[in-house]
């Protein structure tokens, strides 16, 4: 059976955690910050955990090493 290929688009956008979940960057963070409050900007920093309902789909896109 051939090896599963990693979807390169998914690999660029998501990072796998030690427990098998996924982290991703937040949307709405590239420009137009003048329309967002200080609290919104602060909460959009860093990575956020992906919802559990999507994890199964992304595990197929990014197979384990």
From Swiss-Prot:
GO CC terms of this entry: cytosolic large ribosomal subunit
Biased composition (Basic residues): 1-18, 31-44, 55-65
Residue segments, region Disordered: 1-65
GO MF terms held by the record: structural constituent of ribosome
GO BP annotation list: translation
Pfam family, one: Ribosomal_L35p
Family: Belongs to the bacterial ribosomal protein bL35 family.
NCBIfam families named among the record's database cross-references: rpmI_bact
PANTHER family for this protein: 54S RIBOSOMAL PROTEIN BL35M, LARGE RIBOSOMAL SUBUNIT PROTEIN BL35M
Protein known as: Large ribosomal subunit protein bL35
Chain's gene name: rpmI
């Amino acid at each position: 059976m051939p090896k599963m290929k990693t979807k390169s688009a998914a690999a660029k956008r998501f990072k796998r955690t030690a427990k098998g979940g996924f982290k991703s960057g937040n949307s709405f963070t590239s420009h137009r910050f003048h329309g967002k409050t200080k609290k919104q900007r602060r909460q959009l920093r860093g990575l956020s955990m992906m919802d559990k309902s999507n994890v199964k789909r992304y595990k197929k896109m990014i197979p384990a090493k």
